[in-house]
Every structure is written in C-alpha cells, then in structure tokens.
C-alpha cells in the first residue's frame, strides 16, 4: 500500500485510541454503543450522505453487476452485526458496498445466555455463541420497509432454535416469504455452530428441501452459507447441490469451531467456552474453501468470500482466487471504517496496475499483488 496520508494516520490513531477504551468494556456493551452511533448515521439523512461522500471509495472499476444487482463496491458487511436491520441505511455511509443483515429467524428469540461474545486481541479474532438473537422475521420486515436508501441489502436467514429439524423447511420458508421481497438477495444459513443441530442441515439430503422451499418463496437470488469445518468432500457435495438447484451463489465461510494455531493462551480460550471464532484464525481455511469452490463451480455461480480478510493483499487474493464479492465483520471491529476504505483503494490500485478496467476481469485470474 502507498504511504498513509497525515489525515489517514490521524483517523487511525483516534480509532485505535477509542478501541483501547472500548476494549475495557464488555464486548456486547461495545456492540450496543456502536449500534447507537450507527443508528444516528442511519436516521440523519444529511449526515449519512456526507459520510458516504467522504469515507466511501468511488471508483467505477469497483462497480459490477452481480446476479442482476449493481454492487458499487465489492466489500460488504458480513451477517451478525446488524441482526435486526436497525441500521440498514448506515452501511453505505461507512464505506461498504453492501450489507448482509441478520441472521434472522422466523420467530423472535433471545439467543444464548450471556456472556456469549469474547475478544481475542492477540489473534485479531472474536469468539461468539450468540445463538441467532433477533426480533424475528416480521419485525425485521417492518424495519426494512422503513428504509430510505437504495443501498444493496442481503438478508441472512436461519432456523428458529425451538423448531425441530423435521420442521426446518417450513421455518425457513416462513422467513423467506416475509423478507424476500425486501432484500436484494437471501442467504440460507445452515452453518452457525451456535444453534444445536444446525450444521447437520448442511448434509445434502437435509439441505435440498430447505433451499428449494426458500427458492419457491421468493423471486430474489438465493445463496447458501457454509462452514469452514466441512470436509472437502462435503464442500463438493454442497457445491454440486447448489449447481443442481441453480442457486445464485455460495457464501464461504462462517465461523470455525477449531481452536488450532491461536496466539491466545489455551486456558483463556477454554474458559471462554463454546462458540465460533471469526477473524484472522479462519483466513487460511476460508481461502482454501474458496479455491476449492471456484475450481468446482466458479464458472456457474457467484462466490462470496468471508473470513479473516484483514488487508488489501488478502482481499486481492480472494478476488483473484475466484470471489466476486467479499465480506467482513471482525476486521471492521479491529480496523474501523478505514479498513473498508483501505481494502477498496487497494483493489482499485491493483486493477489499474494490471491494466484491468473492471473488478470482474480480476475474478479467478490468479494475478499476483503488484507493489
């Protein structure tokens, strides 16, 4: 990356100092404070527009049409932050090209008992066992219907915890029916480790009727989100099913239940308990899964890569390895809006360095990063 400007350095210094203060608070308390701040951006249109002009990267080379939707920039907010679409109009203002909201379940639910969110600063990671806490599809639909912006929005839907697996199809269908027309795309989440039995629904025989029901319930593109902990054979099976059902794409990957290779002392991690880890520790496996998916089905559907994309170099590698779109959550917590800006500026610079007119030309190209 080019040398940082004094303004950029100042912004990052201020954010880093703020982060140190915030990290003295409980993680969910920080999340609540960030929600309130973003809620102001969401609700004040002039502020929203001003921030978008200042913070977001505006470069025609970053814009692309994906499954019939125009994405102005490739990096989006990953699901898990804006669970209730309460800040749906704020994400473009902080620089994202789109946002995936949720996870939303058909019925409201409180999620798992607290504490359920933990920081691993030594790993630039977060461990969570939130358990799909949300207001339910009907309430989220109301929030979405009150949106003022035309920013691209995806909705991530999951299974209500109390609904048994044998009734999962109807549960997902209900969410899709309520939310589908209010989103630009839907993602079927069967890969969170924090709802008992949910990951079992990734098995093809369980997944097929769920995906088919969601497709029947909406006219918007449908994608499926998978776990990094699937075996290579299971990844292939889900990919083949996605092609068979003509899904719009695959989001890869969710959080990992692996605890290997962490810098955080094992005793501290064990004390945190169960949950999925996001951020830097999942980066290598997420890249592996992306490459496997692209080799198998990349020419037939859109691949959205998420998991530990912390630097512009990593973002470029995901794109050149087959990702049409990118997502992040944990790096946003650690890096703030300038992380989003750096990613987009880095990608635009690489496109220019390689003589490419549009990001679509770089997808799957295997082009190296140019310094």
Curated annotation (Swiss-Prot):
Substrate binds at residues 83, 128-132, 189, 194, 254-255. SUPFAM superfamilies: FMN-linked oxidoreductases. Belongs to the dihydroorotate dehydrogenase family. Type 2 subfamily. Pathway: Pyrimidine metabolism; UMP biosynthesis via de novo pathway; orotate from (S)-dihydroorotate (quinone route): step 1/1. Its cofactor is FMN. This is Dihydroorotate dehydrogenase (quinone). One of its GO terms (cellular component) is plasma membrane. Binds 1 FMN per subunit. It is a peripheral membrane protein. InterPro entries: Aldolase_TIM (IPR013785), DHO_dehydrogenase (IPR050074), Dihydroorotate_DH_2 (IPR005719), Dihydroorotate_DH_cat (IPR005720), Dihydroorotate_DH_CS (IPR001295). FMN binds at residues 79-83, 103, 156, 189, 225, 253, 279, 308, 329-330. Transmembrane segments: none annotated. GO terms for molecular function: dihydroorotate dehydrogenase (quinone) activity. Catalyzes the conversion of dihydroorotate to orotate with quinone as electron acceptor. Keywords: Cell membrane, Flavoprotein, FMN, Membrane, Oxidoreductase, Pyrimidine biosynthesis. It catalyses: (S)-dihydroorotate + a quinone = orotate + a quinol. Gene3D superfamilies: Aldolase class I. Monomer. The active site is at 192 (nucleophile). Its EC number is 1.3.5.2. Pfam families: DHO_dh.
